[in-house]
C-alpha cells in the first residue's frame, strides 16, 4: 500500500498555462467563476490557484488517482465545496440550466475553439456540458499540488483509449 497519493502523469498542456489551455478548449468564464468559488469557500487555496492554474503549465487530466480514504474524503469535501460554489455562482440548478448555460456561451462566442458559433455541432454542445469534469481536473491538480506538492506524488503513465475533439 502506498503512503502517498498515486496519480496519472501530468500532461504539459499546449498552452503556456492551465488557464490558457482551458480558455482555448472551454469557456474561460467558467474557470473564472470557479476561481471566485474557491476564494469564497476555500480561501487557503487562493495562492496555489494562482501558482498552478493561472500560471502553471502542468495539469492532471482524467481525474484518476489512488489514495488513502482519509485523503479521498478531504479531496471530495474540497471538490464538492468548490463545484457547488461554482454552480451557485453560475446559477445552474438543473441539467436544463447547464445546457442553456453552454448554448448561451457558444452563441455569444465565448469558446475560442469554435470559429463560427453558428456552426457548432450538437455533439460539441453535449461535450461542453461536461463542465463539472473539466473543472474537476483543474481542482484535482490544485488540491494535489496544495496538499502534496509534486515530489510527494507517485506518477504513473496511463493510456487514453479514445479522443474525439470537436472544432
Model-derived features with residue positions:
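ER/Golgi luminal nucleotide-sugar-dependent glycosyltransferases, focusing on the catalytic module
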Residues: 1-167
Amino acid at each position: 500500500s502506498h503512503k502517498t497519493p498515486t496519480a496519472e502523469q501530468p500532461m504539459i498542456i499546449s498552452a503556456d498555462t492551465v488557464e490558457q489551455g482551458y480558455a482555448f478548449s472551454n469557456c474561460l468564464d467558467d474557470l473564472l467563476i470557479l476561481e471566485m468559488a474557491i476564494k469564497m469557500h476555500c480561501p487557503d487555496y487562493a495562492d496555489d490557484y494562482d501558482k498552478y492554474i493561472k500560471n502553471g503549465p502542468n495539469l492532471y487530466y482524467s481525474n484518476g488517482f489512488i489514495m488513502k480514504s482519509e485523503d479521498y474524503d478531504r479531496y471530495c469535501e474540497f471538490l464538492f465545496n468548490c463545484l457547488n460554489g461554482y454552480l451557485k455562482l453560475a446559477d445552474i440548478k438543473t441539467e436544463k440550466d447547464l445546457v442553456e448555460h453552454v448554448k448561451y456561451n457558444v452563441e455569444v462566442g465565448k469558446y475560442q475553439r469554435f470559429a463560427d458559433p453558428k456552426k457548432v455541432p450538437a455533439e460539441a454542445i453535449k461535450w461542453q456540458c461536461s463542465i463539472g469534469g473539466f473543472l474537476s481536473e483543474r481542482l484535482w491538480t490544485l488540491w494535489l499540488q496544495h496538499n502534496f506538492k509534486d515530489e510527494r506524488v507517485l506518477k504513473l503513465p496511463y493510456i487514453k483509449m479514445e479522443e474525439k475533439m470537436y472544432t
